[in-house]
């Protein structure tokens, strides 16, 4: 179970990308930054810099399923972006269901009294942390059960 993981969690939105990372043990996800989107080239440059700085070996991207559990137009856009990024950076890609992660992020920030309705970037960063933490928890339980890979 001691497989090292250096994952980067992404909450991809139209205006911003929340980013989270994890410690080498794969136990704890932490919000890192929020990328304000401008162009694909600039987005990828910022993600690439984080990947290199943190020796990332995997991308975990939140997939915004509809409340009915289907892949809608927003999820398709996120998949297209995530596949391009993963391919360009030569990294494996995993998806996590991100339904309600922004609501949960906002609630967590309010509970910690770190919330301002104007700080959407902090919400995106917290949502990325939630997405990555859920993936890490799922991975850990899967490894404890004797599996090696999660479903992609």
Curated annotation (Swiss-Prot):
UniProt key word Hydrolase: yes
PANTHER family attached to this UniProt entry: POLYNUCLEOTIDYL TRANSFERASE, RIBONUCLEASE H-LIKE SUPERFAMILY PROTEIN
Keyword Hydrolase: yes
Entry protein name: Putative pre-16S rRNA nuclease
EC number(s) stated in the UniProt entry for this protein: 3.1.-.-
GO molecular function: nuclease activity
One Pfam assignment: RuvX
Upper lineage: Bacteria, Bacillati, Cyanobacteriota, Cyanophyceae, Synechococcales
Principal cellular location given in the protein's record: cytoplasm
Location(s) in or outside the cell: Cytoplasm
UniProt record similarity statement: Belongs to the YqgF nuclease family.
């Amino acid at each position: 179970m001691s497989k090292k993981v250096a994952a980067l969690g992404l909450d991809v939105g139209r205006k911003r990308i929340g980013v989270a990372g994890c410690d080498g043990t794969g136990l704890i996800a932490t919000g890192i930054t929020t990328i304000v989107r401008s162009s694909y080239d600039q987005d990828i440059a910022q993600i690439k810099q984080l990947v290199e700085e943190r020796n990332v070996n995997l991308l975990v991207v939140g997939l915004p399923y509809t409340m009915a559990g289907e892949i809608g137009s927003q999820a398709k856009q996120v998949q297209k972006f995530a596949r391009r990024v993963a391919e360009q950076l030569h990294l494996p890609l995993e998806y996590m269901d991100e339904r309600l992660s922004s609501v949960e992020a906002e609630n967590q920030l309010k509970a910690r009294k770190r919330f301002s309705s104007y700080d959407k970037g902090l919400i995106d960063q917290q949502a990325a942390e939630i997405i990555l933490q859920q993936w890490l928890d799922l991975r850990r339980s899967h490894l404890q059960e004797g599996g090696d890979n999660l479903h992609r």
